[in-house]
Amino acid sequence: MGLYLGVEGIDGVGKSSVVNLAAEFLEIHGLEVTTVREPSTDIGREALEWDDPYLQALAFTLDRMLTLKRVDFEAADVVLSDRTFLSTLAYQSALGADMRWLLELQRPVPKPDVVYIIDREPLAEDATFDKEFLERVRNRYREAARLIEEEFDVEIKWIEAEDMDKEEIAELIVADARRRLDDPLGIPDDLLEG
């Protein structure tokens, strides 16, 4: 099985563009890449219009499980996802759902090896949501990331992206993915020499 990587962040940070660029860069390096976008099913897309964060969380979790069930993790060197279960924790808790309940709901969901969180100030012109709500979601990402690292075997990597363009962010992800694929055990270079 290859790497399962997720790209996260508030609306408007450029997740979709970064995922597309990173996939393109990885393919240039000869890697087999499968991209995933959440939500991807009718129920997941429909849930975007609902007002109840608990119902949304249930729908997004179903969407996620159905989407990931279709992914052949064995055939890809890298599975790159535009959003992961972390989105449900951040967004639905910002809308009022209990974070612990959301965490338990995600327990059976396949987990990425690494989640890259693109972090920058919300820009009102970029997003579907107002700036105040996105700032609340941004704070919930921090809380959710701490819980996830405690509860699951998922590494969280923050990308401070205030002064970075999408290509630079994608290049960081690609470099990290290639390093992990070349050295899956994470053995420091100095231990491998001599």
From Swiss-Prot:
EC number assigned by the record: 2.7.4.9
Keyword Kinase listed: yes
GO cellular component: cytoplasm
Keywords: ATP-binding, Kinase, Nucleotide biosynthesis, Nucleotide-binding, Transferase
MF term (GO), any: ATP binding
Gene Ontology biological-process entries: dTDP biosynthetic process; dTTP biosynthetic process; dUDP biosynthetic process
Disulfide bonds listed in the record: none
Record's protein name: Probable thymidylate kinase
Source species of the chain: Methanopyrus kandleri (strain AV19 / DSM 6324 / JCM 9639 / NBRC 100938)
